[in-house]
């Protein structure tokens, strides 16, 4: 037994199970309520449902990851059945320590294409080289180097936004990625000084903080991808920080969105499973490789459990469109 594309296919189905459908229901209902709620906030003496917004932000991040990586896993599995090797497109992006690393792990082929066919050609075109020469002469070597890089990166991220959709929310999403990456690069010397001063680089608690910070920052930026009303999205993000109310966790607000306690249990269990497998890959190695080294009875036993989980928790039946991947849009 040297390879098993069926494992990838089953893991994809597990990712696209009932938890993903529940998250989609939650997100649709939150976004449907947001616009009406934004008008009510100015007229009613109460705080907005910030916990619902935060939950939607986190669920959307989880749903996208399951949808995108699940679609790629099934594609890789089917391709291997036919003897074709397909490039891995997602490499544990939510374990990234900064946004630059995140984009080296998320939608890898897209990033490579934009780099090879937009960033580099623009960087070395004659007008850009002339601009670089002019900037070095009049503003110094440091600024001269940055001008071409930043302008090329601006075009890349603007185009990336348009590629996701011809709407302002996607453009804002792309440019926010651009701004954060550029600011991070400018602050890199300060980061290095901080790391040397406090000797935290490489320490597990600090790396966990970096991963959590990157995940939350990307989740906030991704809200512009989720909802088309840009001003309202800014307002949603703002209220999450300025009007957070921990009491919403206990007053039944989350249950009023459309999910029951049992639904939330499914979501949490699904998250734990995906997180555990991802952490296993970080600490031990590829799960698939490890499984193939086990005795056949263990391997097929795990496969049987996965099939049963799909049968019990899977979203299927009348009215369910199994081909309705978010990833199909991109």
Region annotations inferred by a language model:
Residues 1-278, 282-329:
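Membrane-embedded transmembrane alpha-helical bundles that form the catalytic cores
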């Amino acid at each position: 037994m040297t390879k098993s594309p069926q494992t990838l296919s089953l893991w994809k189905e597990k990712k696209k199970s009932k938890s993903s459908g529940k998250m989609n229901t939650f997100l649709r209902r939150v976004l449907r309520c947001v616009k009406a709620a934004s008008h009510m906030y100015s007229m009613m003496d109460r705080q907005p449902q910030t916990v619902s917004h935060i939950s939607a932000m986190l669920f959307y991040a989880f749903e996208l990851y399951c949808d995108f990586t699940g679609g790629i896993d099934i594609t890789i599995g089917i391709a291997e059945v036919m003897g074709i090797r397909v490039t891995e497109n997602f490499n544990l992006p939510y374990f990234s320590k900064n946004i630059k690393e995140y984009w080296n792990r998320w939608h890898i082929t897209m990033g490579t294409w934009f780099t090879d066919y937009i960033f580099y050609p623009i960087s070395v075109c004659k007008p850009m080289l002339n601009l670089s020469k002019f900037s070095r002469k009049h503003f110094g070597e440091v600024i001269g180097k940055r001008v071409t890089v930043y302008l090329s990166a601006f075009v890349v991220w603007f185009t990336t936004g348009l590629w996701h959709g011809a709407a302002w929310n996607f453009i804002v999403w792309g440019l926010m990625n651009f701004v954060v990456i550029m600011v991070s690069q400018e602050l890199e010397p300060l980061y290095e000084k901080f790391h040397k001063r406090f000797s935290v680089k490489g320490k597990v608690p600090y790396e966990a903080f970096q991963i959590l910070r990157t995940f939350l920052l990307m989740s906030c930026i991704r809200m512009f991808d989720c909802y088309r009303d840009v001003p309202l999205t800014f307002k949603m993000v703002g209220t999450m920080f300025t009007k957070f109310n921990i009491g919403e966790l206990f007053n039944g607000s989350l249950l009023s969105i459309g999910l029951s306690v049992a639904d939330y249990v499914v979501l949490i269990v699904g998250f734990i499973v995906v997180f555990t497998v991802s952490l296993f890959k970080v600490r031990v190695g590829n799960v698939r490789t490890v499984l193939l080294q086990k005795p056949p009875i263990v391997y097929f036993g795990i496969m049987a459990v996965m099939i049963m989980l799909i049968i019990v928790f899977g979203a299927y039946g009348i009215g369910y469109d199994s081909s309705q991947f978010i990833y199909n849009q991109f």
